[in-house]
A protein has these predicted regions:
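Short helix-capping segments at alpha-helix termini
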Residues: 8, 90-94, 243-244, 275-276
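Acidic-glycine-rich active-site phosphate/pyrophosphate-binding loop
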Residues: 45-61, 124, 139-150, 270, ...
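N-terminal helical capping/dimerization or prosegment-like subdomains
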Residues: 1-47, 215-219, 232-240, 322-327
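Active-site metal-coordination/substrate-binding segment of hydrolases
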Residues: 34-99
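Hydrophobic/aromatic beta-strand patches that form the interior of the parallel beta-sheet core
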Residues: 13, 36-38, 101, 126-128, ...
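Short acidic loop-to-helix transition motifs that present clustered carboxylates
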Residues: 19-22, 109, 134, 287-290
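Metal-dependent amide/peptide-bond hydrolase catalytic core
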Residues: 139, 148-345
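Acidic/histidine-rich catalytic neighborhood of metal-dependent amide-processing enzymes
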Residues: 73-146, 190, 344
Length: 345
């Protein structure tokens, strides 16, 4: 990525903040007055399972590119760079700067965007997060909060369980309360983003079969709305569970949202319709993303728009239609021209 972007004459920052963890930030034009930011993440998830084609082969078959990260989101990153290349190759004057942000560790702990926040100030009029949306215009996504919930007991020999306190039994009661709370959360709705949700994802407890467990831990995630964060959900959970469990924040990724009639949505709809010939679909991104680093952290109106289907992300036989990638390039070119290229005189 660095080599490609430097080859376009862009001012490139290569930030290897950890071994094999790299952010690439590239600028064309005035970096203090940016018209549009185009974002992608460079990392992918693991490749367990039996694949039709080798997962890192990038096999082209049936008009699709197959492989891990093809949809999430190597195709989006490639389309961003191809679009910037096309715009700069045209030689038109820029009225505002263009910024490309490619980060590491989105799939894990968001270290790349956290590093970006620490090291880089960005002021811009618009941002496109090139996550896989099937070229639909996504105005935002719910936030992602997660927690460790821990119960404590007293270990003893399992032949006399009443001599101790079984932390797994305590956790079983906690989980029943969480199931009821999760049902309650589905009644909390946002017109654009749907309902809140809560799910128990993992459980660990006990060290030996013949020992009453003194400790049990689960991991819980909740999807939340703009203006909410992990501390608020933590407080609700702790009040619900009282002394039965300890609630510790694991992660906190804020929601991102722009109005459906905002300028960036209207502009994206026009560009998608122009390129594809179809009426653009406007909806929400069903998963989580790092869009809030730009919309909330930098105050930039931000949408999600990219090739590929999020429904195939993280799955065996992930793939993306080549036509969607080609259309994405043209859509990004159109967006860049509207936000950053000077009009012909």
């Amino acid at each position: 990525c660095e080599e490609v972007l430097r080859g376009l004459g862009m001012d490139v920052q290569f930030d290897e903040f950890e071994p094999n963890r790299v952010n690439v930030i590239a600028y064309a034009g005035n970096r203090d007055d940016i018209g549009i930011v185009l974002y992608g993440h460079l990392d992918v998830v693991s490749t367990a399972g039996k694949w039709k084609y080798p997962p890192f082969s990038g096999e082209l078959a049936d008009g699709e590119i197959w492989g891990r990260g093809s949809a999430d989101m190597k195709s989006g990153c490639a389309a961003v760079m191809a679009a910037v290349k096309a715009v700069l190759a045209a030689g038109q004057a820029l009225k505002k700067g263009i910024c490309v942000v490619l980060v590491a560790d989105e799939e894990n702990k968001n270290k790349g965007c956290n590093r970006l926040k620490e090291t880089t100030q960005i002021k811009a009029d618009a941002c496109i997060v090139a996550e896989p949306t099937k070229l639909q215009v996504h105005y935002g996504n719910r936030g992602y909060t997660s927690f460790f919930l821990r119960t404590f007991g007293e270990a003893c020999h399992a032949s006399n369980p009443k001599a101790g306190k079984n932390a797994i039994y305590v956790m079983a009661r906690v989980i029943q309360k969480l199931e009821a709370f999760a049902e309650e959360l589905t009644g909390r709705k946002n017109r654009q983003l749907g309902c809140m949700s809560l799910s128990v994802g993992t459980i660990r407890g006990g060290v030996n079969l013949n020992t009453v467990p003194a400790f049990c831990e689960i991991e819980v995630e909740a999807r939340v709305f703009p203006g909410m964060d992990a501390s608020g959900i933590q407080k609700e959970l702790q009040e619900l569970l009282g002394d039965e469990a300890e609630v510790v924040i694991r992660s906190n990724l804020l929601a991102s949202l722009v109005p459906e009639d905002s300028e960036i949505v209207r502009t994206a709809v026009a560009c998608v319709s122009e390129i594809t010939g179809d009426e653009a679909v406007i909806t929400r991104f069903p998963a989580c993303s790092e869009a809030s680093y730009f919309s909330v952290g930098y105050g930039i109106p931000t949408i999600l728009l990219g090739p590929g289907d999020i429904g195939l992300a993280h799955k065996i036989d992930e793939r993306v239609p080549v036509k969607q990638i080609e259309d994405a390039v043209d859509i990004y070119v159109s967006m860049i021209r509207r936000y950053a290229v000077a009009e012909d005189v």
